[in-house]
Amino acid sequence: MDAQTFKEWQDPEINAVNRAPMHTNFFAYESTEAATEAVKEKSANFMTLNGIWKFRWVKDSDARPTDFWKIGYNDKGWDDLPIPAMWELNGYDVPLYSGVGFDWKLWKGWCKNNPPVVPVENNHVGSYRREIIVPSDWKGKDIIAHFGSVSSNIYLWVNGKFVGYSEDSKLEAEFNLTSYLKPGQKNLIAFQVFRWCDGSYLEDQDFFRYHGVARDCYLYSRNKKRIEDLRVTPD
């Protein structure tokens, strides 16, 4: 898929678009010495995406910006927000707690469940933008974006092009950005997160309902020929 349809967030048949296959959680270091130290943040194959991003929050999903991912978009009036960070803990609305039942049922006037439909009203959307410079020596390698946990979904663009989409709030989402990034040059990363999507019907847990980016995000580089996944089969 070369462009987002913006129907993905309410389509139960679409859980991901262009998301890399799930795999065993490990990090590939550039040398035996680096692997022995086992601090990926020091690795030449690692680049953090944590830190300050330009950020815009809207109360209702139909008020979200739809062209913010374009190169040259003016975001000077936007807020600054670090990632990882949950919206409700940074002044964007308040946390809701629900022991049983979906959190949109706590909102007056929208109390019915109608899967896969979720509300437009009070369905907050956060939009993020940031320019980065990818190491020039990553040219010729595969470059993967890792988003540790994003609630409830993520639409991703790089340099004005749609990359992909993912749901599953508590699972990491990875995307191969090799064909989108320009190592050694400025690159625009933009993504958008909805408070609720159709996948929220599968996430009725007993806890405070927070939204945004909950875990570390980063880029990492891999050689073209590599071990992609590990499996252990017992006797």
Predicted features along the sequence, with ranges:
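Accessory beta-strand-rich segments of carbohydrate-active enzymes
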Residues: 2-20, 28, 39-40, 54-58, ...
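A broad, low-specificity signal marking well-ordered, structured residues that form hydrophobic/aromatic
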Residues: 47, 76, 81, 126, ...
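Hydrophobic small-molecule pocket/channel-lining residues, especially in calycin-type beta-barrels
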Residues: 62, 80-81, 90, 96
